[in-house]
Each structure stands twice: as C-alpha cells, then as structure tokens.
Amino acid sequence: MEGDMVAKVKRETVVACMTCPLCDKLLRDATTISECLHTFCRKCIYEKITEDEIESCPVCDIDLGGTPLEKLRPDHILQDLRAKLFPLKRKKERAPEVVSSISLPAKRKERSISSLVVSTPRVSAQAGTTGKRTKAATRKDVRGSGSFTKRTVKKEEEFGDDHVESASSPETLKKFTQNKRQSSYANPNQSLSNRRNKDVDEPWDSKLHLWKPLNFLVDVANGTKDPKSELGNASHNDVQGSKTKTKDHKRKCKLEEEISNNGDPTTSETATLKRTRRTRRKRSSTFGDSRIPLLPGAASLKQERRNGHVWFSLVASSNQEGEASLPQIPANYLRIRDGNIPVSFIQKYLMRKLDLKSEDEVEITCMGEPVIPTLQLHSLVDLWLETTSKHQRVAASIGSSAKEFVMVLVYSRKLPECNN
C-alpha cells in the first residue's frame, strides 16, 4: 500500500528546486559545486568563473581555492529528474527528420539491384533455343539493348564524346538483328573473336566501346566482378595520366626557355648555377651558425613567458626552531595567471593559510637569498633562470616528474631586527 501512494506537489515548488540561480531558467546540464552543493547550469557557472575570474561560489561565497573549475561536478540525478518532469522539445522535433533522411537511400539501392538481377538471365536462358521463340526473344533483346545503349550513349555525350553513334538508329538495329540470326544458327560455344572474323563487312571495332558498360553490368549482377576494383583502376589511370601531362608541360617550358636564350645551352646552365648560389647565400644568411642564439626569438620567448602563467613551489624552511617555525601548507605547487603580481601577494596568501596577523611576519627566500616584496614574479623568474646553470642540459622523458624545472620559494617567519 505504501508504494501506491501518490503525493501532489505544486509546480512552483518543483521549479524552484530545478532553477539555475544565475539565469533563472530550468537547469541544463546540471553542475554542482562539491564544496557547498549549489547547482547551476554548466554553461552559466563556467562563464561566471572564467569571465569574472571568481574563486568562490556565487551564492554562498565559499572559497574554492586557486582552481575553482576542478570543484565542479555534473549532477546526473537532478538532470534526469528535470528531463522527466520538464522534457526538452528539441528532441521530439528532430526525431522524424532523421528517420526520413535515413530511409530514402535504402529504397533506391534495392531498386537498382533488382533491375540488374532481372535483366541479366534473359540473354543466357534464350541463347540455345530455336524457331519462333528465338526470333521473338531476339526482337525483345534488341529492343531492350537499344534502350540500354541509348542511356549509355547519352551519358557519354554528356562527358564530351561527340563521335559516339547511338545504337538506336535504324542502321545499327538492322546490323544487330542480322548478327543475332547468324549467331543463333552457329555453334553456341564459338568465341566472339571468330564471329568478328566471319563478319568482316561490319565495322565492329567502332561499336565495341558501346558494349563495355553492358558487359560490366552483367558481370556485376552475376557476382564475377567487383565494381570497386574497376573504379579504383580508372581513378589510378586518371591520376597517372595527369602526372605525365604535368611532366610533359614542365619539359616543354624548359625547352622554350632554352630556345629563347638564342639557342646557347651555356646560358641556361649559367642561369641555374646563379640560382643555386643565391639559394645557398640565402640559407647561410637566414640560418647562420646554430651555436649563436637568435635575438628576436629569445625576445619573443621572454615576452611569452611574461604574459603566461607562473608555476612555483612553496616549501617551509627547515632551519626554523622553536615556536616561531611555520608549518608546511598542503598545496605546495601553485600557479598564478598574471606574472606582473608582486611577491607581497604570496605573503598575503601565506598569511591567510597560516592564520597570521600580518604579511610582514613572513619572509620569502629564493636560492638562499631574501626576496623583496615589491619584486614582480616574472622578474623573479628571470633572476632564478640566471642563477641556475646556463650551459647544463637536463634530459627529461615524457611523463616524468617536473620538480627540477619548477622554481622553489622557501618561506619562514621573519625574525625581528635587533637594534644596537
């Protein structure tokens, strides 16, 4: 009985639970912040964090750390409830269009295959018969072949073959019927080459290209030939023909240049030598010695480093003693987007993490030297690169640790100055 109970709830109360607080619309791709469990549309919360550069929840202002996008999680349960209670209309409208677009090509394919299979067995089945039936069959074959050859001739005329004769003309039909009658009385195992030798008066060589597409269709219907192989060979031959044409054209251009130079072969040779010398000079001037660094490239790399992110590691000093020692923070690897921020920003961050009264209680050192709080981070990175070994190369593999390539900043409690 308990499972059959139904409770009625007002629509306004359900909509309030499934509304994004940023766009005031129903949730789309519900995304929840793992720290405070507030839910938003995925597009809304991503744009809010990236464009406004906030590091806290827009509703409760809880701190999300340096990488707030990593605290976002997709809420599939809430999204499924929203889809069941308030379904989207776009899916219902697009469904019939997809079905109609897919169903059309299958029908065309079935028609084309059936037409091939039905038209092929008539010729082979009626080849050995005699009498009136053979005459009627030959007439039907002549009509069918005439219509078929009309189609092939029309296709060839579209591609520019103006010399092809249509097989539906009265002269070709008469010749075709005469050949059919002679072949019906002859031996059926006789080859096509012997028939050509007997019928010397008729120019069969001029009409062989009309029967090639018909024979190909018959072979495809019987399953003896693969249509893809023929198409592949044709395309391969076309590509080879175009390559040979381009080579011949280049050779003709070279010959014309040599002829234009008053017929002297030495002038063309000197011209080619001058060209090679010019290219060698250009290469030597542009590339130069590989050991000398290029100044414009170094300046551009330095500018990119100044505009990019700054990675560094914060490590507590090991020389601290007593109650004045500062503990190690959990997230020691940090990234700052703006390299123009001074070092005092890091001191403020440590003050918040370690619950100190002021930022002056923290002292930051790099490579054993104290760092001025007003120094900018990109300048500090340049100093760190200069103090490290310049000419030593460190081999690194993909996927290995990058601890050796990250700037290390050591923090400790600043000791009060002794006044003498």
From Swiss-Prot:
Comp. bias regions, Polar residues: 113-123, 166-194, 232-242, 260-273
CDD domains reported for this sequence: RAWUL_DRIP_like (cd17087), RING-HC_PCGF (cd16525)
Catalytic activity as recorded in UniProt: S-ubiquitinyl-[E2 ubiquitin-conjugating enzyme]-L-cysteine + [acceptor protein]-L-lysine = [E2 ubiquitin-conjugating enzyme]-L-cysteine + N(6)-ubiquitinyl-[acceptor protein]-L-lysine
GO BP, sorted A to Z: protein autoubiquitination; protein ubiquitination; response to water deprivation
Record keywords, A-Z: Metal-binding, Transferase, Ubl conjugation, Ubl conjugation pathway, Zinc, Zinc-finger
InterPro entries reported for this sequence: DRIP-like_RAWUL, DRIP1-like, Znf_RING, Znf_RING/FYVE/PHD, Znf_RING_CS
Expression by tissue: Expressed in roots, leaves and flowers.
Biased composition (Basic residues): 244-253, 274-284
Stretches with biased composition (Basic and acidic residues): 154-165
Region annotated Disordered, chain positions: 113-201, 226-289
Zinc finger (RING-type) boundaries: 20-61
Processing after translation: Auto-ubiquitinated.
Protein's name according to its UniProt entry: E3 ubiquitin protein ligase DRIP2
Annotated gene: DRIP2
